Curated annotation (Swiss-Prot):
GO terms for molecular function: metal ion binding; metalloendopeptidase activity. Binds 1 zinc ion. This is Mitochondrial intermediate peptidase 1. Keywords: Hydrolase, Metal-binding, Metalloprotease, Mitochondrion, Protease, Transit peptide, Zinc. It comes from Cryptococcus neoformans var. neoformans serotype D (strain B-3501A) (Filobasidiella neoformans). The active site is at E531. Belongs to the peptidase M3 family. One of its GO terms (biological process) is protein processing involved in protein targeting to mitochondrion. It catalyses: Release of an N-terminal octapeptide as second stage of processing of some proteins imported into the mitochondrion.
Length: 761
């Protein structure tokens, strides 16, 4: 059994890591600008156009080489097809993924515009390659060949199968004219999806302000100063609010008058016909694309290579969860109803009043206060500066996986804003294994779409690239500038040299001032640990092949490492190892941790049921068939009436703010699915009997058991290191072990049922 020295606070001293995040950084010394993210081609916005041309030229050469491989006289060239396809994917994705970051986070509109253009060009180019019969035929010939004495490895076969699935999902076996339809529909979906996401990120339309008549009366419960600060139509006229604004949120949460809350809710969720049209057109385009591919629905297409496999399996999983959770969610609503009854002075009926959507936040706030002896809790934010949390993360990861964070100063021009910090991820041998850029702090104009993890570059082995056979003449790129290729670095325990991963985490955690650090609330802390779970998957999942590296795995598996990280941060024993007051250095009192964790669990059934509803909505929207009409608002209202515990609100169209409908189309269930698996792994590997009161034990032995290297190594070796290079069902079965592990490893309907039971437990 692997054991590390007993945890002490001295061992967890923050060193240089906490100041790296908790103090303003001095500007880098004057020097010629470095390229963005230290990637040589990214010197200026106008460098993206030649990089795009270079990328297409290199990709064209690789396509020609791969397509010619079956007719090549040397069988070794056919043997290289999987490697060369992976190189082709890396050449394109290395630029596309970088542009995805730039167009979402860069404050310079010139960079954003250039990235948008490159992104569109290369995504369209990639969609065309997905229908290339030359590439597909070469891959089929490769996997059909025996290659005596040098067969394809399991990793190569996994990568090949991933590419074959991509081709077949793109209708590769269809006639040429039909394949052209695939490209057209895919381009339409890409364009509509981007528009839909921009609407969702922007929040409710502000074209028509919310009007609150007689604000002095309707806004009782809010301070007179707040009410007086609201703009008016005229001196004694109604107060005007921007939908979704901070002021609107304050009224929705704290106004005692139900009519005020109702006006704000409807105004913030009102139906915008243009936005509804974009969503419904995108969903219909997906249904049309499914029809082109010979599938009934987009859900059939999207789930064919996921763990769940079919829409029927997903619906069974979600329906069983909804049936199980609905009584508990209804009990949560009943608690809110009782609070509403107490505040409804004129009520004459003995029946409890209905809790509407505009009541939920208001009475949830009151319910939380009712659980506390004095109506409130001392804040925990002073114990969680960003630097303290990062130090705790680094030490936790060191104990579990043998990796840690090293703060690194950035060069002038390396990052898109001075507040961005760089971390090098180090192994136990002092070797860098990757880079994380942390864009964690608020700034004017920063996109407010929430936290995100961007993979700028995936890992892959590069020293065995057969680039001499690409058919490109010497100096072919001289007029196009540098590419994204690297020489690679040696990694401990791995043969060859690897391209190291680069990831970016973005959040909105306040600002660092000379007067003090940015402090994290509980939700912020969960967000940081969750997003870091994705980053660590990228760092540890360094496979030989780009296409299965790190987070490039099934959508309904990719959230597992991140949700597992949430379990660690919910452990008082783990929190007690690093949470200290940013001014006094006093440890966070354990009773305060426990009280906040208990508060965080209040109304949890209602929140879980809301997630189930959203996942069901995603399935319903993506289960429409070719030619079917769709009224997305009617579908949402019916679902709330049939399965929900809070009635729908007519005249609203919340679904246009559900941005995950694009990125997670038909796979939003993944959060619930991976939560079930993460809970099982947590109890099997890490908690091991420390559930309930035992989990609150905060002596060093409790932390040692939870942060056990034995458990960390098991998860690292059986899950994280594989990225997407192994069947996820087999990974889950391997890490769970025993009879349940054997059953779940089969990945059949019974395995799905078993995961559902884990969630219910």
């Amino acid at each position: 059994m692997l054991r590390l020295p007993r945890i002490t606070r001295r061992a967890l001293s923050s060193g240089a890591l906490a100041p790296h995040f908790d103090r303003p950084l001095p500007p880098p010394p004057p020097a010629p600008p470095a390229p963005l993210c230290a990637l040589p081609p990214l010197t200026a916005p106008d460098a993206l156009a030649p990089l795009t041309r270079r990328t297409v030229r290199h990709a064209d050469a690789l396509v020609a080489r791969i397509a010619a491989a079956p007719a090549h006289p040397d069988p070794a060239e056919l043997r290289r097809v999987v490697k060369n396809l992976d190189r082709l994917s890396d050449v394109l994705c290395g630029v596309i993924d970088m542009c995805e970051l730039v167009r979402n986070v860069h404050p310079d509109p010139h960079w954003v515009a250039a990235a948008e253009k490159t992104y569109e060009t290369l995504c369209s180019f990639m969609n065309q390659l997905n229908t290339s019969t030359g590439l597909y035929d070469a891959l089929v010939a490769t996997v059909s060949h025996t290659f005596p004495g040098n067969p394809l490895s399991p990793a190569e076969l996994r990568v090949a199968q991933t590419f074959l699935s991509d081709f077949e999902r793109s209708g590769i076996q269809l006639p040429p004219g039909v394949r052209a339809k695939f490209v057209r529909h895919s381009d339409n979906i890409l364009s509509l999806g981007r528009t839909f996401l921009s609407f969702a990120a922007a929040g409710p339309s502000a074209d028509t302000p919310i009007e609150i008549p007689e604000p002095e009366v309707l806004l009782a419960g809010l301070s007179s100063k707040f009410v007086a600060s609201l703009p008016r139509k005229k001196r004694k006229g109604p107060a005007l609010l921007a939908p979704g604004s901070w002021e609107a949120q304050m009224i929705g949460r704290y106004a005692d008058n139900e009519e005020a809350r109702r006006l704000v809710y409807i105004g913030s969720m009102r139906e915008d016909k243009d936005r509804v049209y974009v969503l419904e057109t995108m969903l219909k385009e997906r249904a049309e694309l499914a029809h082109v591919l010979g599938k009934e629905t987009w859900a059939d297409v999207a789930l064919s290579d996921k763990m769940a496999k079919t829409p029927q399996n997903v619906l069974q999983f979600l329906t069983s969860l909804a049936t199980h959770h609905r009584p508990s969610a209804a009990a949560d609503v009943a608690a809110l109803q009782r609070l509403k009854a107490l505040s409804t002075v004129s009520r004459t009926s003995s029946q409890l009043p209905t809790v509407h959507a505009w009541d939920r936040d208001h009475y949830a706030e009151q319910y939380a206060a009712s659980l506390l002896p004095n109506g409130s809790l001392p804040s925990i934010t002073p114990y969680f500066s960003v630097g303290t949390a990062m130090s705790g993360l680094s030490h936790m990861l060191s104990r579990l996986y043998g990796i840690s964070f090293k703060p690194v100063s950035v060069a002038h021009g390396e990052v898109w804003h001075p507040s961005v910090r760089r971390l090098d991820v180090m192994d136990e041998h002092g070797k860098r294994i990757g880079v994380i850029y942390c864009d964690l702090f608020s700034r004017p104009g920063k996109p407010s779409a929430g936290a995100a993890h961007y993979t700028v570059r995936c890992s892959r082995r590069v020293d065995d690239d057969p680039s001499e056979g690409d058919g490109l003449p010497p100096g072919w790129d001289q007029h196009l500038g540098k590419g994204m290729e690297v020489q690679g670095e040696a990694l401990h325990g791995k043969e060859g040299k690897y391209q190291l991963p680069i990831v970016v985490l973005t959040t909105d955690f306040g600002t660092v001032e000379e007067s003090g650090p940015a402090l994290l609330g509980w939700n912020d802390l969960e967000t940081l640990f969750h997003e870091m779970g994705h980053a660590i998957h990228s760092m540890i999942g360094q496979t030989e092949f780009h296409n299965v590296s790190g987070t490039r795995c099934a959508t309904d598996f990719v959230e597992l490492p991140s949700i597992l990280m949430e379990h660690f941060i919910s452990s008082p024993a783990v929190l007690s190892t690093f949470a200290t007051h940013y001014t006094t250095n006093e440890p966070l009192p354990i009773p305060l941790i426990q009280a906040h964790l208990q508060l965080d669990q209040s109304l949890k059934a209602l929140e879980t049921h809301s997630q189930i509803l959203m996942a069901l909505l995603d399935q319903k929207y993506h289960s429409i068939k070719h030619g079917e009409q769709l009224d997305s608002t009617r579908v949402w209202n019916e679902l709330q009436s049939q399965v929900g515990v809070i009635p729908p609100v007519r005249g609203t169209a919340w679904q246009t703010q559900f941005g995950h409908l694009y990125g997670y189309g038909a796979t939003y269930y993944s959060y619930l699915f991976d939560r079930a698996i993460a809970g099982k792994i947590w109890s099997s590997l890490f908690a091991r009997g420390r559930t309930g009161p035992a989990a609150a034990n905060h002596d060093p032995a409790a932390a040692e058991d939870i942060l056990s290297r034995e458990g960390g190594e098991a998860f690292k070796e059986k899950v994280l290191k594989w990225g997407g290079g192994r069947d996820p069902w087999e990974m889950v079965g391997d890490v769970i072990g025993g009879a349940e592990g054997e059953q779940v490893a089969k990945g059949d309907e019974k395995a799905m049922e078993l995961v559902g039971r884990w969630m219910i437990k």
